[in-house]
């Protein structure tokens, strides 16, 4: 049932929905509904993962025109593998990276299947879990997927006109350094023109005049 997972946040949502006379239902893979000019299709979970709320995360893809956005919750390798084994089409323009960039999510095989133009990691700065992990970031980097992180860039907005997606952000943490600085002293290097964040070890860093550095 919709109230079988007991957390305060979830209970508050169910309570508020009840107060508003809204019926809360559990979607199934294949369910589609319209949201303005967009459509939302639920792709997973494709298996019952019992009491594991992470692997049992809802997976949904929002389509608008020729663009799409994949939301993966906190799913891990097991749920990813099951979706791929079930031949679920997970391709998307933008991937919201699972589980804040956990080491146990975003396998290379899954990332290849999604083949996103952009990846967004929603994660708090200096969190206790060490997210996003170097393992997840390395897998994204190996496939040359541009990554945008809320802990480095603040609020991130992905806008679609139905044909292309534009990524913008608002941050107070990024500081522009003089060209004499080098990536050796930093963990991440941003491109002020393309708005892409690279690992400092990436072989495709922007020119010095287009760099912004993050520790």
What residues fall within each predicted segment?
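Mature, structured domains enriched in cysteine- and short glycine motifs
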Residues: 176-215
């Amino acid at each position: 049932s919709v109230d079988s997972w007991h957390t305060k946040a979830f209970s508050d949502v169910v309570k508020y929905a009840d107060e508003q006379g809204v019926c809360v239902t559990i979607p199934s893979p294949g369910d589609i509904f319209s949201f303005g000019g967009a459509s939302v299709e639920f792709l997973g979970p494709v298996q019952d993962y019992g009491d594991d709320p992470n692997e049992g995360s809802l997976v949904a893809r929002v389509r608008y025109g020729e663009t799409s956005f994949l939301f993966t919750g906190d799913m891990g390798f097991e749920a990813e593998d099951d979706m791929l084994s079930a031949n679920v089409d997970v391709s998307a323009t933008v991937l919201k990276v699972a589980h804040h960039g956990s080491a146990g999510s975003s396998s290379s095989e899954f990332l290849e299947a999604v083949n996103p133009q952009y990846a967004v990691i929603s994660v708090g700065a200096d969190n206790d879990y060490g997210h996003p992990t170097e393992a997840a970031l390395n897998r994204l980097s190996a496939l040359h997927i541009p990554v945008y992180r809320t802990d480095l860039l603040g609020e991130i907005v992905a806008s679609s006109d139905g044909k292309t997606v534009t990524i913008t952000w608002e941050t107070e943490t990024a500081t522009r350094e003089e060209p004499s600085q080098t990536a050796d002293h930093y963990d991440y290097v941003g491109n002020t023109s393309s708005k892409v964040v690279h690992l400092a070890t990436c072989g495709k860093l922007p020119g010095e005049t287009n760099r912004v550095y993050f520790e």
